[in-house]
A protein has these predicted regions:
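Hydrophobic alpha-helical scaffolding
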Residues: 49-53, 66, 70, 95, ...
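Secretory-pathway-linked proteins and extracytosolic
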Residues: 1-93, 97-98
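Amphipathic hydrophobic-ligand
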Residues: 212-216
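Extended non-catalytic domains of envelope/secretory-pathway proteins
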Residues: 51-57, 102, 128-131, 173
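Active-site-proximal structural scaffolding
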Residues: 56, 73, 77, 109, ...
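Short, conserved phosphate-binding/catalytic loop or strand-edge motifs used
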Residues: 61, 96-103, 140-145
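Hydrophobic/aromatic-rich core segments of domains that either
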Residues: 118-207
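Active-site-proximal cofactor/substrate-binding loop regions of enzyme domains
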Residues: 75-79, 83-88, 100-114, 118-134
């Protein structure tokens, strides 16, 4: 085994300015590449980490609540999204394995809070229980200056959402945004590449950049 030591002297303190891009775009930094061959290899690891018990003891009650007032399957998807947004508080506690492995859906419901991985897994579980094609999705926000294809490491992916395909169209659901409705995409992931679960692997999708009126 080899040990590499990097020593830097006389570095100036980065200046943070309002409206400036994230530090990764402007500040020199070391990037540990890791051992993944490509984004498929990295997603396989992520999917394995997300392979937890998805049993929800009171699932029938939750689904009955979600179905109330829904007149179409699309409204059921919207209600499911809204249920997770309103019942689960976004709180990222990332220490040890929890930085990469989501809590079980049952535990997330019990605690009433979860990080992006836990919330997206709960959303995926509830949608799949209703027969929808919901999939795990790993993505890097606009804070990251490189894509998972360019740099297949966990440094290029810092967020998790759920993608549901309905009538041939992908809907990107980020439940960490408490009030965003179905069909809208948070600004920080618009135009970003996402690794969307497909069979045993993943497919790379580029999220759309919405017009200004759809972001207000």
């Amino acid at each position: 085994d080899s040990v590499f030591t990097y020593v830097m002297h006389g570095l100036s303190v980065p200046v943070s300015e309002e409206g400036a891009p994230a530090w990764g775009y402007t500040v020199p930094h070391l990037l540990v590449i890791g051992s993944f061959k490509d984004e498929q290899d990295m997603f396989a690891w992520s999917k394995k980490m997300a392979d937890v018990d998805c049993t929800i003891p009171n699932q029938a009650e939750i689904l009955a609540e979600i179905a109330q007032g829904a007149k179409s399957d699309k409204e059921k998807i919207a209600n499911t999204f809204a249920w997770v947004q309103s019942h689960i508080r976004y709180l990222a506690y990332e220490a040890g394995v929890s930085a990469h492995q989501p809590a079980t859906p049952a535990e997330t419901i019990r605690k009433r809070y979860g990080d992006c991985k836990a919330m997206s897994l709960l959303l995926k579980t509830l949608l799949k229980a209703q027969g929808f094609d919901a999939r795990q999705t790993d993505i890097g926000t606009d804070d990251i200056p490189y894509t998972s294809h360019e740099v297949p490491t966990i440094s290029s992916v810092n967020h998790a959402i759920c993608t549901v395909f309905y009538q041939g169209k992908p809907y990107y659901l980020d439940a960490t945004n408490s009030y965003i409705p179905l069909g809208y995409i948070p600004t920080n992931i618009q135009g970003r590449q996402a690794l969307v679960e497909e069979g045993e692997g993943c497919r790379v999708y580029t999220l759309p950049t919405l017009p200004l009126e759809a972001c207000s």
